[in-house]
């Protein structure tokens, strides 16, 4: 199993920090193929602090246990590893299957496995609505990572940055009401630009209309996260797509921020 095909991101569960992993490899091979039962179980670990997350040493120990289970369960027929999440001194792991008996029997022989549970999940709600990251979660995680990148380059996040947000629309008539909302609503920006014609870089790409909004903000506080969440919801409201943001400090090296 290739970890490069695991989607990893941070979120929260019941107000506690959580680290999610979703397996995005061969989903089409298993989804809709009769694997309508989900087997869920937990492994306890020693939390590092009040966050409930493991230390680096404890994490390595935990992942070794996870791989021990993966090796055994993925060798069984008609089994798909959906993912897991780490939160509040536990990792909860999810597998889809046609028949749960062999999985349950295998898990019952592993002394550190707890709380084995089997449920029907005909349309994979747990995978698509819980384990898999939403577009907003992906952008928030990218924002966190790229603020760390700025700091690693010696930049002070309390400085004022020129931040450019980008939006795509598949139809021109969707773009203009969106821009009206930005202009008339409570949105702070220095410039607002759009493409007069649809953009299509490659023959196979779907053409789109582009809107770019620039604003000057500090990246020291939560404002950039609030802006990302606000623009994600606004673009969705007008049937567009919020692509993400980049800033002047990294534009020179053509490094997009998400």
Swiss-Prot record:
Top-level taxon: Bacteria
Pfam short name (any one): RraB
Protein name, per record: Uncharacterized protein HI_0040
Organism of provenance: Haemophilus influenzae (strain ATCC 51907 / DSM 11121 / KW20 / Rd)
Stored InterPro entries: CHP01619, DUF695, RraB-like_sf, RraB_dom
């Amino acid at each position: 199993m290739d970890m490069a095909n695991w989607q990893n991101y941070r979120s929260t569960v019941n107000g506690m920090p959580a680290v999610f992993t979703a397996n995005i490899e061969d989903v089409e091979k298993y989804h809709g193929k009769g694997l309508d039962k989900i087997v869920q179980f937990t492994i306890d670990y020693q939390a590092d602090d009040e966050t409930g997350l493991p230390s680096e040493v404890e994490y390595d120990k935990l992942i070794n246990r996870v791989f021990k289970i993966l090796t055994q369960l993925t060798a069984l027929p008609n089994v798909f590893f959906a993912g897991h999440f780490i939160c509040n001194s536990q990792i909860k792991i999810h597998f889809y299957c046609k028949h749960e008996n062999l999985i349950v029997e295998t898990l019952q022989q592993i002394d550190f496995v707890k709380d084995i549970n089997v449920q029907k999940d005909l349309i994979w709600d747990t995978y698509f609505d819980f384990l898999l990251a939403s577009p907003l979660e992906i952008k928030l995680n990218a924002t966190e990572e790229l603020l760390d990148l700025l700091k690693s380059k010696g930049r002070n996040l309390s400085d004022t940055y020129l931040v450019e947000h980008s939006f795509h629309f598949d139809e021109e008539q969707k773009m203009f009401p969106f821009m009206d909302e930005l202009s008339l609503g409570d949105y702070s920006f220095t410039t607002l630009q759009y493409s007069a014609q649809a953009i299509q870089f490659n023959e196979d790409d779907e053409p789109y209309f582009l809107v770019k909004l620039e604003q000057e903000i500090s990246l020291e506080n939560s404002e950039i996260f609030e802006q990302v969440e606000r623009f994600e919801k606004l673009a969705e409201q007008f049937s567009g797509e919020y692509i993400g943001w980049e800033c002047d400090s990294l534009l020179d090296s053509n490094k997009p921020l998400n």
